[in-house]
Design a protein with these regions (language model features):
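Conserved nucleotide-sugar phosphate-binding/catalytic loop shared by glycosyltransferases and other
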Residues: 4-12, 29-78, 87, 310-312
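Active-site-proximal region of nucleotide-activated glycan assembly enzymes
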Residues: 6, 34, 44, 55, ...
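Donor-nucleotide binding loops and adjacent catalytic segments primarily
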Residues: 43, 48-52, 175-180, 184-260, ...
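Glycosyltransferases and closely related glycan-assembly transferases
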Residues: 85-98, 106-121, 134-139
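Acidic donor-binding loop of glycosyltransferase active sites
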Residues: 95-97, 243, 255-270, 277-278
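A short, well-ordered alpha-helix in the C-terminal region of glycosyltransferases
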Residues: 331-343
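C-terminal alpha-helical cap of glycosyltransferases
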Residues: 342-358
Length: 358
């Protein structure tokens, strides 16, 4: 009997740094890997990973910011503490390989892997690498990426175009189950799914709610509005179902949805592409981010997969006309997505992990 293979996975902070790891887990287990997950003590990744029955270990983590904040003085010490904890854990677990999906908790784990001479592979979802991955690249053997445009920002001897791992269960949702869960009276109208990212989006929530009467004339609406963003006044409105967040139910909601309005996080838009869902992307503004969502959205718009509405242009009128435009031309968007020739991301990444396993 061969030696058992071990992998440590890391990544957290937002759902986009966790769900691709979850997508890889069944294939890694099938390939014979024993998985341990290292995340932050109380990050959202803890709940998501423990729901998969994967051993989870929390370490100290801090955020590296590009702006002034008093926490900038204390957080480097948290990161250093996390680095020490990660070294101890890796020496104890003795994994063959480390796989990181990014986010600040991943930096000490990847750098600890280099210190312990354990090969580390990281995955960058966005067109330009985020700060955490830019630091972690130094400790990585290979860097997987989502977009062809990203290759030029990465060391040529490390960069590999893999696409984004998509959870297989997303393709097997039950539309009728979503009708029941959302309390819709029937399936006589097309369904518009609105997703503001794992923490929600005030700009999208406000714009959608202002035009609800007009939207509800033609659509049933599923609105994932983020934690603490439910509107009590809209409870019981026929054809409008609002939820803070969806986990297991999301696959059914995707199956029911005819089109989507979404932020432009790389993982979210890759799921829309894989499912061939016509969509309107409203990327986080450059003022509120490093601009990665704007680049992601423009790449998808250029390829004919998405309609982009920048947050600065988001009004009641522009939103309604965008919905009309995309819904009336939905077949064109679906055709472009169906012809995109997507990669077998999970298979490619698992092979890469196996190539680095001692």
């Amino acid at each position: 009997m061969g030696k058992s293979k071990k992998i440590v996975m890391t990544g957290g902070g937002t759902a986009g740094h966790v769900t691709p790891n979850i997508a890889l887990m069944p294939a890694l287990q099938q390939a014979g890997y024993e998985i341990t997950y290292i995340g932050s003590y109380n990050g959202m990744e803890k709940e998501l990973i423990e729901a998969q029955n994967i051993p989870y270990i929390g370490i100290s983590s801090g955020k590296l910011r590009r702006y002034f904040d008093w926490k900038n003085f204390s957080d480097p010490f948290k990161v250093l503490k996390g680095y020490g904890q990660a070294i101890s854990l890796l020496k104890k677990i003795k994994p063959d390989v480390v796989f990181s999906k990014g986010g600040f908790v991943s930096v000490p784990v990847v750098l600890a892997a280099k210190h312990c001479h354990i090969p580390a592979i990281i995955h960058e979802s966005d067109i330009t690498p985020g700060l955490a991955n830019r630091i972690a690249i130094r400790g990585a053997k290979k860097v997987c990426c989502n977009f062809p445009e990203t290759m030029k920002y990465l060391p040529s001897d490390k960069a590999i175009l893999t696409g984004s791992p998509i959870r297989r269960e997303l393709f097997s949702g039950d539309a009728d189950a979503a009708v029941r869960y959302c309390g819709f009276p029937d399936r006589n109208k097309p369904v518009l799914l609105i997703v503001g990212g794992s923490s929600g989006s005030k700009a999208i929530n406000d714009a959608v709610r202002k035009v609800l009467p007009e939207l509800l004339e033609n659509f049933y609406i599923i609105h994932l509005c983020g934690k603490g963003n439910l509107d009590e006044h809209l409870k019981g409105l026929i054809g409008y179902a609002q939820f803070e967040y969806a986990s297991a139910e999301l696959t059914d909601m995707f199956a029911l949805a005819d089109m989507a309005i979404s932020r432009a996080g790389a993982n979210a838009i890759c799921e829309l592409l894989a499912l061939h869902k016509p969509n309107i992307l409203i990327p986080l503004s450059a003022a509120a981010s490093r601009g990665d969502q704007i680049l992601n959205a423009k790449s998808f718009e250029k390829q004919g997969f998405s309609y982009v509405l920048e947050e600065e242009q988001l009004t009641e009128q522009t939103l309604l006309s965008a919905v009309d435009e995309v819904f009336n031309n939905r077949d064109i968007y679906v055709k472009a997505m169906a012809e995109s020739g997507q990669m077998d991301s999970i298979g490619t990444i698992v092979k890469l992990i196996e190539s680095q396993t001692k």
